[in-house]
Amino acid sequence: MFRGATLVNLDSKGRITVPSRYRTTLNEASEGQMVCTIDLNQPCLLLYTLPEWEKIELKLAALSSMNPAERRVQRLLLGHASECQMDSAGRLLLASTLRQHAGLTKEVMLVGQFNKFELWDEQVWYQQIKEDILAEQTSQEPLSTRLLDLSL
């Protein structure tokens, strides 16, 4: 399980260095084999271990290519999916098309989200957090049953 937000640098070759606290888990889960794709709703990337991504691929394969919405999701997620191998120094090379999609420049936020990471441009991440907090503070919508059961 991945949690927390960490600032990492994107080097001139388009690589990020995975924080050491995650490396053992990633090596045990997938021998450092990762898959990165776009997020359909946010300007960020999604980074999965290969076994986690394979679960998603099975779900995507079950969608109908005859349904335009389902085909669109398949095209976007699978079409942007890029395998990346963590090297011995803990670095991952991110495809240039993915970096461009998320607007990643020098400083990147690596955000743990249970079974995956999100990769955000640092400034976009902090702006999104401000917007999310404001939305929660001003929301008039009733909480879902699942959120009502959440006790912090």
Curated annotation (Swiss-Prot):
Q: Name one GO biological process term.
A: negative regulation of DNA-templated transcription initiation
Cellular localization per UniProt: Cytoplasm, Nucleoid
Give a yes or no for keyword Cytoplasm in this entry: yes
Question: SUPFAM superfamilies this protein is in?
Answer: AbrB/MazE/MraZ-like
| One MF term in the entry's GO annotations | DNA-binding transcription factor activity
Tagged with keyword Repeat = yes
Positions the record marks as coiled coil are none
Keywords carried by this UniProt record: Cytoplasm, DNA-binding, Repeat, Repressor, Transcription, Transcription regulation
Tell me where in this chain the SpoVT-AbrB domain is found: 5-52, 81-124
The domain of life is Bacteria
Listed Pfam families: MraZ
Q: Which GO cellular component term is one of those annotated?
A: nucleoid
Q: What is its main location?
A: cytoplasm
Q: Which Gene3D superfamilies match?
A: Transcriptional regulator MraZ domain (3.40.1550.20)
Q: Say what the protein does.
A: Negatively regulates its own expression and that of the subsequent genes in the proximal part of the division and cell wall (dcw) gene cluster. Acts by binding directly to DNA. May also regulate the expression of genes outside the dcw cluster.
Assembly and interactions?
Forms oligomers.
Family membership, please give it: Belongs to the MraZ family.
Instruction: Give the protein's recorded name.
Output: Transcriptional regulator MraZ
